[in-house]
Amino acid sequence: MKLQLVAVGTKMPDWVQTGFTDYLRRFPKDMPFELLEIPAGKRGKNADIKRILEREGEQMLAAVGKGNRIVTLDIPGTRWETPHLAQQLERWKQDGRDVSLLIGGPEGLSPECKAAAEQSWSLSPLTLPHPLVRVLVAESLYRAWSITTNHPYHRE
């Protein structure tokens, strides 16, 4: 199984790159994790936000591998405690399909992305900055992996 993070935004601060890359490198070779960045639509005073969301959504879905399980990151999604995320990761592995996790831009995800998702994951009821979400997702998935393999990273 391969994990794929598809996220809107291409110019992240150095701390985001450093944090995300740190966790990315920790994943084992049998569970590759990749990041695909989708350019954010140009937002301005007179921007058509609905159209921008639609375009971003089209690009995100086009980046998802055929047959991949799509999981959106969205506030109204399911909140998993760490042990539950580890169980979810195991179920995804047993399913045998690659998993694409979608992070939208400032206005969130398009309705098409939400409709295409098999699952929706909420990190928090708080609105989080999208760059931070990349690091949180990578760390959370690495921690879940560490639980499933009895790696000492996670401590109760």
From Swiss-Prot:
Q: Where in the cell is it found?
A: Cytoplasm
Q: Name one GO cellular component term.
A: cytoplasm
UniProt keyword terms in alphabetical order: Cytoplasm, Methyltransferase, rRNA processing, S-adenosyl-L-methionine, Transferase
Where on this chain does S-adenosyl-L-methionine bind? L73, G104, L123, S124, P125, L126, T127, L128
Asked whether the keyword Aminoacyl-tRNA synthetase is assigned, the reply is no
Taken from the record, one Pfam family name reads SPOUT_MTase
GTP-binding as a keyword of this entry, yes or no, is: no
User: What does it catalyze?
Assistant: pseudouridine(1915) in 23S rRNA + S-adenosyl-L-methionine = N(3)-methylpseudouridine(1915) in 23S rRNA + S-adenosyl-L-homocysteine + H(+)
Q: Write out the GO MF terms.
A: rRNA (pseudouridine-N3-)-methyltransferase activity
InterPro entries from the entry? Alpha/beta_knot_MTases, RlmH-like, tRNA_m1G_MTases_N
Predominant location: cytoplasm
The EC number of this protein is 2.1.1.177
- Quaternary structure (record): Homodimer.
Functional description taken from the UniProt entry:
Specifically methylates the pseudouridine at position 1915 (m3Psi1915) in 23S rRNA.
The molecule here is called Ribosomal RNA large subunit methyltransferase H
Q: Which organism is it from?
A: Pectobacterium atrosepticum (strain SCRI 1043 / ATCC BAA-672)
Query: According to the entry, what is the taxonomic lineage of the organism?
Result: Bacteria, Pseudomonadati, Pseudomonadota, Gammaproteobacteria, Enterobacterales
